[in-house]
Amino acid sequence: MKLKWYWLGTFGFSLLLSHSAMAADTTLDEIVVQATLRSIPIADLPESVTVLDRDTVQAAGVQHFQDVLGLIPNLNWASGTSRPRYFQLRGIGEVEQYQGAPNPSVGFLIDDIDFSGVGMPATLFDTRQIEVLRGPQGTAYGANALAGLISIRTADPGTSFTLKSEITGATYGTRAAAVAVGDGSAAGDLGWRLVAQQYLSNGFREDAYLNRSSTNGLDEGTFRGKLHWKLTEALQADLTLMHVNINNGYDAWSINNTGTTYSNQPGRDAQRSDGAALRLVAAIGGIGELRSVTSVARSKIGYSFDGDWGNDVLWGPFAPYDYYQSDDRSRRTFAEDLRLIGDPSRVLFGRIRWLAGLYTLHLTESDNLRYVFNDQYSGAGSSDLDSQYSATDVALYGSLESELGARSTVSAGVRVEQREAHYADSADLQTPFPRQTNHMVGGNLSWARKTGDGEHVYVTLARGYKGGGFNIGSQILAEQRSFGPESLWSIETGFRYTRPKSPIQLQTDVFYMRRQSMQVYLSEQLQQNNPLAYVFYTQNASQGENYGLEAELTYRIDDRWRVSSSASLLRSRYLGVSGLFADLGIDGRAQPFAPSYKFSAALEYQHPVGWFARLDVTGMGSFYYYTSDSQTSSAYSVENLRAGFKHGSWTASAWVRNLFDAHYAQQGFYFGLIPPDYSNQSFLDRADPRQFGITVNYELGR
């Protein structure tokens, strides 16, 4: 608690300090948000958003989106994978997908390609901008963005030759190499860009039984191509192709909660994704602009782990006690977003700007879930579950925006969506799963006002939604085999200060969200002597609420020093629960992975000669891991440091992540594992320890 108030006090003091220095002559660049229905300067956006630009990503990150998560208010992730897949915004999101069909609450896009629920391909090299929209995106994105949206955009082709290369070496066997090359015509009619990167690391764990330090290793390759082509004065095309091959090990858990594991069958966490997106923009004279974004993606995912985290030598007289689980998954998506944007010079009734769109998404996923076991009670054996899931979403949406006088703007949007989903598996031959059809409506109503030079306030009322889904397993009762949609109402008010030629940018917001027919994820261990004998299911509870505040500040003190910081407070609760949920005693309790506070602060120095440095401090409060038990994390803070020298096209930097080697957990389980009594106890997935590294960059053009 002292840590919480210390950092919030520091943040507040920095606001006062920066306000007194607004007359400084250093300026910050304008930020444009692109993940919204139409590109818009951040000052004019009537909702909460965090934007990390190219320089911030390069200074604060090393390899993956995971490296910069701490900079974003009210964003968390559930570990249990080698890289983040499951995110929570403002306390809402998934914690895992051990069984069943995909049903994300947080949308995840990379260059217009949908990776919601499978966001491991989010490597950082050559990233141009990361945008995180908090709150329901009921008009723009619908069912996959109940809690918000994460959008990553990589560098586009330029108008001249560009070359960028990078090599990294670090402790724990880490090494990486990357190159980006591109060219384009001076007029911007034609341009291309190619990217290749490979990253390897031992992965911060030591398997004492196998005497190996790479069982939790990272092996990540990224390949991407982009083409920009202006076919005519009225038509342009942008094509993105990507291939990301992640072949990571997974051996993170230990019976004594340390970085030393004892697995005899280490797992893997692999994802091979291929994706393509084609964006066409056509000018239609007298009407406006027609935009078409077509995207396809295919991901093959292999996830496995040692179920008992041990070996027969470790278990001694209780051996054999050996479990292993693997899940081989294949996902395909096809999406089309067709949008007509009215010509700003030909507004309706002299003042109303408009747009309308049609969206469709088709997703198919097949799974092979396999359990292998050998113990004193059941002997040796295995079981398999094969499943298929498909869902088709079709949505119509539209938006109107009008000026109310010289300073105020009002906007409204609506989205009507239908989802048809079907699930079948090898265990449902006698009682097939019913086909599920959901009809959902979302939208927003916003008012914004320019209160002064560079000062904006806004109020937004929004409604989001999320489709229903399926529960699997022979232990699931017939009436529990499916669950219904969830909806969410949100009201938010905020203030932004983005005065031109000012060294300061500030944004704050306060929000309240009420969840209806809230989807709650539960798990239960069925046999104390079997660590894989679990049933996982989701049910609709009565209600929930999530409310809090968020603030971000960037202040360029002078041409050498810059300060940036963020802070968020969050309160989440289950409300009016009954039945099974009442038996769990969760009424009024916080929701999982919803820390009560989160903060970040960064100090940057840039000397005219070329020396530079950046110190980051990030942290968050404690949170519950799961609804089914009362285990919580501990509050923590982490420091990262980077310093180096830039000369011409060359940059060399030395960096340290987790500078003071903080020990904290990022995930926790509570169950019976250790013989002979198999009593329930807490097991923790420890975060990465301190790591030192050196990175050298060469860049010609941008």
Summary of predicted features, one role per range:
Residues 30, 563, 619-626, 645-702:
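C-terminal beta-signal and adjacent terminal beta-strands/loops
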Residues 97-98, 105-136:
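Short acidic/polar hinge/loop motifs at secondary-structure boundaries
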Residues 162-164, 169-201, 205, 209-248, ...:
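Transmembrane beta-barrel wall of Gram-negative outer-membrane proteins
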Residues 279-285, 289-307, 450, 455-464, ...:
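Membrane-embedded beta-barrel scaffold of Gram-negative outer-membrane proteins
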